[in-house]
Amino acid sequence: MDEFVSLVIGYFLGNILFAMIVTKIFLHKDPTKYGSGNPGTANVGAVFGKKWGILTCIGDLAKTLAALLIVYFIYHGNRLDLSFAGLGVVLGHSFPFWNHFKGGKGVAVTALWIVFFDWRAGLIALLIGLFLVIIMKNLTIPPLVYMLGFSIFTWINFGWEQGLIFLIATLIMIFQFRKDIVDFFTGKGKRVDVLVTIKKKLGIYK
């Protein structure tokens, strides 16, 4: 019963799509009608500007943290309950019932979830993801790699139930990224050079 309650708490908080909130309140626009049509951080940032993308990301991180903290204090930090809460947020964010089950891809959500679950392993996974973003110049494959790696780590160190939950979340992300994955392997994927972007911001790009 604890696990079900945790899942439900996560799902309903996950339904809060800050991409929709930010763009509709401040820009009076619907992000699903622009760019990739995805109500998530990347699309908002790409179409409307980095400021709005960052604001969206902060909102998605906040709802994830809220769900995890609620479950943490209700069930005294039980890891299995936290796993279900995180999965619930991923499900709610990816398949919100009020938006015809069309949501975001869950990168920000999963990033905070894995750090909250095990901050050392989570940070290592994110650093690996960042390294892959830099060398691959791609934003699709790295989050899938770090989530798969974290799933394996969790399975080995915390048992098959925990590992399976994170693996399910990884499969959800793969489903949400399915078009981007095809584009990547067919050479149509968008290239993002993070180092060049940083250098431009610092005014040292030549």
From Swiss-Prot:
The UniProt entry lists membrane topology as: Multi-pass membrane protein
Q: Which GO terms describe its cellular component?
A: plasma membrane
Please indicate which superkingdom the organism of origin belongs to.
Bacteria
Q: Where in the cell is it found?
A: Cell membrane
Residue stretches spanning the membrane:
7-27, 54-74, 81-101, 114-134, 155-175
Which key words tag this protein in UniProt? Cell membrane, Lipid biosynthesis, Lipid metabolism, Membrane, Phospholipid biosynthesis, Phospholipid metabolism, Transferase, Transmembrane, Transmembrane helix
- What catalytic reaction does the record list? an acyl phosphate + sn-glycerol 3-phosphate = a 1-acyl-sn-glycero-3-phosphate + phosphate
Q: Which Pfam families match?
A: G3P_acyltransf
What InterPro entries would the database entry show?
Answer: G3P_acylTferase_PlsY (IPR003811)
E.C. no: 2.3.1.275
| MF terms in GO | acyl-phosphate glycerol-3-phosphate acyltransferase activity
Q: EC top class, in one word?
A: transferase
Chief location: membrane
Q: In which pathway does it act?
A: Lipid metabolism; phospholipid metabolism
The GO annotation for biological process reads:
phospholipid biosynthetic process
Query: Assembly state and interactors?
Result: Probably interacts with PlsX.
Q: Which family does it belong to?
A: Belongs to the PlsY family.
* Purpose: Catalyzes the transfer of an acyl group from acyl-phosphate (acyl-PO(4)) to glycerol-3-phosphate (G3P) to form lysophosphatidic acid (LPA). This enzyme utilizes acyl-phosphate as fatty acyl donor, but not acyl-CoA or acyl-ACP.
Q: What name goes with this protein?
A: Glycerol-3-phosphate acyltransferase 1
- The organism is Lactobacillus johnsonii (strain CNCM I-12250 / La1 / NCC 533)
